[in-house]
A protein has these predicted regions:
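Ribonuclease/tRNase effector modules and their secretory precursors
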Residues: 1-80
């Protein structure tokens, strides 16, 4: 599984306190039912991040078979 990082998505994906390692781990260890297709080429994964917190990651494939993360943030208890 390949990830593509650049200045834009690195800043955008980590602005809510998630690390690159945490984001990649959530995607790599996605459970049954993930990734979930959202439309417009976007996919959602939710899973355990660092310290047992739940993290939401949204990504696109760009180029094909390469994950380009566009959003990541910890989920509150009500958001799980």
């Amino acid at each position: 599984m390949r990830f593509r990082w650049n200045a834009w998505n690195l800043e955008h994906a980590t602005k809510h306190g998630c690390t690159v390692d945490e984001i990649e781990s959530v995607v790599r260890n996605a459970g049954r039912g993930y990734p979930r297709k959202l439309g417009d080429g976007k996919y959602l994964v939710e899973g355990r991040g660092t310290g047992d917190r739940f993290v939401e990651v949204i990504f696109i494939y760009s180029p094909p078979q390469t994950i380009y993360v566009i959003h990541a943030m910890p989920l509150s208890r009500s958001g799980r």
